[in-house]
From Swiss-Prot:
It catalyses: ATP-dependent breakage, passage and rejoining of double-stranded DNA. Disulfide bonds: none annotated. Relaxes both positive and negative superturns and exhibits a strong decatenase activity. This is Type 2 DNA topoisomerase 6 subunit B.
Amino acid sequence: MSAKEKFTSLSPAEFFKRNPELAGFPNPARALYQTVRELIENSLDATDVHGILPNIKITIDLIDEARQIYKVNVVDNGIGIPPQEVPNAFGRVLYSSKYANRQTRGMYGLGVKAAVLYSQMHQDKPIEIETSPANSKRIYTFKLKIDINKNEPIIVERGSVENTRGFHGTSVAISIPGDWPKAKSRIYEYIKRTYIITPYAEFIFKDPEGNVTYYPRLTNKIPKPPQEVKPHPYGVDREEIKILINNLKRDYTIKEFLVNEFQSIGDTTADKILELAGLKPNKKVKNLTEEEITRLVETFKKYEDFRSPSADSLSVIGEDLIELGLKKIFNPDFAASITRKPKAYQGHPFIVEAGVAFGGSIPVGEEPIVLRYANKIPLIYDEKSDVIWKVVEELDWKRYGIESDQYQMVVMVHLCSTKIPYKSAGKESIAEVEDIEKEIKNALMEVARKLKQYLSEKRKEQEAKKKLLAYLKYIPEVSRSLATFLASGNKELVSKYQNEISEGLFKLISKKLDLINIEEYRKVYRVDNE
């Protein structure tokens, strides 16, 4: 006879403490990188989403060499956090301000709490927070830990001081075991790639070796922040319907519920849906049975005439900022970008942006440099398992004038959506959703056509150079002979005529060959009349 099984439950905090790799913390190197990433993302969501030009300072210090404990501190000039929310925001797993129906960098209410859990597993220093909401006269300070069994914050210390320096924003410091030598390149790459798509931000990064890197603000143009929108009927299930009903503050009929709580449903559409679902418009929504809720959701899925989800909940980077970032970091000969029109999958709106940079200071490689972004987050790890890489790899670049194994090219793709289909809670690779994959391909093909046009014009210029060089070598001889003939033996006129004829022939050849930059060729192929 077997022993009885013992059943128990785990709090969310206990679950992620036992499975840190699910949140992107499998080892010290990745943990250090992930901590930096989560804190920077929080800082950006506290700034640009609210129309504030970000000023972000990142510091990593080695505070315990024997145990390889690093202190990561990120300071921003964002909106700050209400002091009453700080303990839960940093000490309760799956507690977040990012569950609204709009685009945010964070999704799960997990990120920074996962760093706190990993920190507690290996050392005893609490997380340190300083925050001051806009126009606050106080700066609030906290030292926190997480009660793993209860999934609740433990307030080790709290206080406040007078805000004499007019500070608004948040400073977060976490002590964590790390491996800087292994994480170094990834962290630098993450900050660089973040800067590429946020050229309106200023970053200062001090690493454990004392090196300070400054990323200056290149523009004051900031993307339109995303707006919270109502759910689209395609994107809800039974449980979400029940939550919406339970949270209602008014005693709606079913029809009023559909019209007021969903996008893309007006009076006429509501009548059609209720007729198809066999529901009475005047029935109180809180009296719906389980079976009626099921019928309503099934009707949502079958109805084909909904308008597409609103894109107001999304915030794109924009073509100008993409090209500005690519040009600043890679110094290419050519850069182009495209922002596609909004599409939807499973009721969730999404937009794909793509950019390409070619030539210049970009190194030649067997593969293009691929920059992957989701909701303005650089994706550094798990590159080859991502749908973006899959599309880049499958695209026939030869068709666009790029020779295989000779890629002097950067390819950038950004996916923004109210729901990014990540493969895991670590948020490093995007799943292969058919609608998204198709749109990524369309975006890359569109920007690749711009590259093809540039390369075609460049090859045309190179061919023109060769022809011009061939013609130019005859100009001195032809101009000298014509000048001698026209001067009729007058040596003083020979030089004058020769210069005029040479210049005229040069301009004629340049015009005939349709050269783009005449002055460039005048310098390269200067006619020598001496």
